[in-house]
């Protein structure tokens, strides 16, 4: 799973995802992309599942770029623990995704192959996405 090698602070505030993506909203590397339409949190497991779905769909052809990285720790207290006694331990890593953010990009495949691969990946993600093509 993807996670930062080291972080300055072990635990972070929850925070909220508001507004639209300004950076990372355009295709920079490939000819085809998968863009988020809704906001949400993307876990490292979901990101990896989407990447595997794309790579299995296109087999050995094409190049894939992953444009998001899970850099926010999510904490969780153990089951059946009384309230209080501080914040829980880091459980998983998530990426905060805003509407308009490009999640994956692909190059070296046909439009139909890219569309099918991104549809398979979209089923693994917790929010709505759309297919982008470079003009």
UniProtKB/Swiss-Prot annotation:
GO biological process: translation
Listed Gene3D superfamilies: Ribosomal protein L10e/L16
GO cellular component term of the entry, any: cytosolic large ribosomal subunit
GO MF, one annotated term: rRNA binding
Swiss-Prot/TrEMBL keywords: Ribonucleoprotein, Ribosomal protein, RNA-binding, rRNA-binding, tRNA-binding
Subunit record text: Part of the 50S ribosomal subunit.
Biological role: Binds 23S rRNA and is also seen to make contacts with the A and possibly P site tRNAs.
Protein name: Large ribosomal subunit protein uL16
